[in-house]
From Swiss-Prot:
Annotated EC: 3.1.1.61, 3.5.1.44
Leader sequence segment: none
A GO term for molecular function: phosphorelay response regulator activity
Recorded catalytic activity of this chain's protein: [protein]-L-glutamate 5-O-methyl ester + H2O = L-glutamyl-[protein] + methanol + H(+); L-glutaminyl-[protein] + H2O = L-glutamyl-[protein] + NH4(+)
Domain notes: Contains a C-terminal catalytic domain, and an N-terminal region which modulates catalytic activity.
Protein name per the record: Protein-glutamate methylesterase/protein-glutamine glutaminase
The species this protein was found in: Rhizobium etli (strain ATCC 51251 / DSM 11541 / JCM 21823 / NBRC 15573 / CFN 42)
Length: 347
């Protein structure tokens, strides 16, 4: 049996530190080795204790979590899980943290929540196991192709991601031209975060990116992100495909679920689709991607070396669902090739 993941809990609230410590300490594979109430205490604790993982509150006195994270990633890179309030402001800060290099995020529980921090221990263990090189500089982002350079086919693109997906999706979608194929995405994320993430992607990418709404028509040049929370994203509609938000129990522990999205794309589009599974914990999306491949779709998976967590892509690959495994930097361009988004004048 491997040694427990050693965690430092950083939060200015003694109550929240106690709750996080209690939740993590209930898992025998996790050991809370220290607590800190602000960035100064945390800096000294990191030097003294050398934790495997840090949980870090976004909002703290003196130096906020975002500024402290930047210092960690510059001076002593390590896996950091951000703990944020479930507000628009908290979501914006958390998304910025994930782009800086935070491993993942969790939302602070609301009043009466049944299982506060229910998946935190699993995220901590995944963070401790990760082989990611946190000190690697981010790759330069190439400008997106121009609209005039491409003509788009009739295929739908479906993408699923979880831990590490914020950075991965930005890397993929920034390769898309403004007239990209209709694209639907399920990214595991707390409920209030997906709207902020869609807005952020819309600012960073050439196509229009929006949080999916029930009945929204799938259109060229638009990307639809499943809202976090109570419903799953599906596609339906035959010759006039649209987004559907459906009430169903969680699948693979998730709502929205990547499997639910991929299943619906397989049924609606068959061979006229491309399925992509990116970095993430667990197995959500693997069975759905296999269904897409059996229906004739082209399927891609992210390579282990470029994943933050090689979980979902690994299971999909082992099931035979992945036609090609590619490094993250190559996935966007391959999607365009497979959707017949070719340069004008070529056949």
């Amino acid at each position: 049996m491997s040694a427990p993941a050693r965690v430092l809990v950083v939060d200015d609230s003694p109550t929240m530190r106690g709750l996080i410590t209690a939740v993590l300490s209930s898992d025998p594979e996790v050991s809370v080795i220290g607590q800190a109430g602000d960035a100064l205490e945390a800096r000294e604790a990191i030097k003294r204790l050398n934790p495997d993982v840090v949980t870090l509150d976004i909002e703290m006195p003196n130096m906020n979590g975002l500024d402290f994270l930047e210092k960690i990633m510059t001076l002593r890179p390590m896996p950091v899980i951000m703990v944020s309030t479930m507000t628009h402001r908290g979501a914006e800060a958390t998304l910025a943290a994930l782009e800086i290099g935070a491993f993942d995020c969790v939302g602070k529980p609301g009043p009466g929540e049944h299982r506060p921090f229910g998946d935190l221990a699993e995220k901590v263990k995944a963070a401790a196991r990760t082989q990611r090189q946190f000190s690697q500089p981010a790759a330069a982002v190439a400008p997106p192709p121009s609209v005039a350079d491409f003509r788009v086919g009739r295929k739908i693109v479906a993408i699923g991601s979880s831990t590490g997906g914020v950075e991965a999706l930005i890397a993929v979608l920034q390769k898309f031209p403004a007239n990209c194929p209709p694209t639907v995405i399920t990214q595991h994320m707390p409920p209030t975060f997906t709207k902020s993430f869609a807005e952020r992607l819309n600012r960073l990418c050439a196509p229009v990116v929006q949080e999916a709404t029930d009945g929204a028509r799938l259109e060229i040049g638009k990307i639809y992100l499943a809202p976090g929370g109570e419903r799953h994203l599906q596609v339906s509609g035959g010759s006039a495909p649209c987004c559907r938000l459906v009430d169903r129990a969680p699948v693979n522990g998730h709502r929205p679920s990547v499997d639910v999205l991929f299943d619906s794309v397989a049924e609606l589009a068959g061979r006229n689709a491309v399925g992509v599974i990116l970095t993430g914990m667990g197995r959500d999306g693997a069975a759905g991607l296999l269904k897409m491949r059996h229906a004739g779709a082209r399927t891609l998976g992210q390579t282990e070396k470029t994943c933050v967590v090689y979980g979902m892509p690994r299971v999909a690959h082992e099931l035979g669902a992945v036609e090609q495994q590619l490094p993250l930097t190559a996935i966007g361009e391959e999607i365009l090739k497979l959707t017949a988004a070719r340069k004008e004048g070529t056949e």
